[in-house]
Amino acid sequence: MERRLGVRAWVKENRGSFQPPVCNKLMHQEQLKVMFIGGPNTRKDYHIEEGEEVFYQLEGDMVLRVLEQGKHRDVVIRQGEIFLLPARVPHSPQRFANTVGLVVERRRLETELDGLRYYVGDTMDVLFEKWFYCKDLGTQLAPIIQEFFSSEQYRTGKPIPDQLLKEPPFPLSTRSIMEPMSLDAWLDSHHRELQAGTPLSLFGDTYETQVIAYGQGSSEGLRQNVDVWLWQLEGSSVVTMGGRRLSLAPDDSLLVLAGTSYAWERTQGSVALSVTQDPACKKPLG
């Protein structure tokens, strides 16, 4: 059954889970995987997936190392900033002590594989890689990382060609990666439009991820094949579904499960986000 969760209250209650060696805890694990991650946790491995990831830094800063168009790059995501990582971009999160970040990703399709790679220094040469169907990244990564640290490749720093795929399951993205942006500053700059009742997309329509900001007004969520995560940032709103009315106060969140219709009434001064990730909207390779 759907229930409200205060984001910061939930983080406070689960703060012990954000320390090493676990460093993360799932708030939701349905079609959408909504998780919060702490640190310190520095990594050498790069994760690759066919879906996108939303990052938001609740407390402190983080660094997301990525491979962008054949080059290594550090993306600094500061406290209060939001960022969308495109699909098929190798990425390696670097998190520090006393930080907490939100990450939203989706359940994988049965045809999709995730990859874990180590590169030779700052080159694009693959040192070690494993491809797998991802059910639970939190439990599946550790054995692969342990395998790497016990491997000949780790000891010698040289790849074993026979253990690398001649053709990966999919090509890496060639998209340019956007800069993180302050969520508060973006909302402030669009305050008039939001309070006039105009929903606005933070990242446009060229991604399968939709992060929509809503001000006062009403809307109906038709029955969808994907989950919808709602996060009330300011003011209040009421979500009605299945004959139940759920009031959302500032910082409350609600996961509307796939296949559920709902009505959403937002009061004057309300500001809220809606997050969806629909693999049916996957864009052509690029």
From Swiss-Prot:
It is found in: Cytoplasm, Cytosol. It comes from Homo sapiens. Residues 161-177 are annotated as: Linker. It holds the Pfam family 3-HAO. This is 3-hydroxyanthranilate 3,4-dioxygenase. Pathway: Cofactor biosynthesis; NAD(+) biosynthesis; quinolinate from L-kynurenine: step 3/3. The keyword Transcription does not apply. O2 binds at residue 43. HAMAP family: 3_HAO (MF_00825). Residues 1-160 are annotated as: Domain A (catalytic). It is an enzyme of class 1 (oxidoreductase).
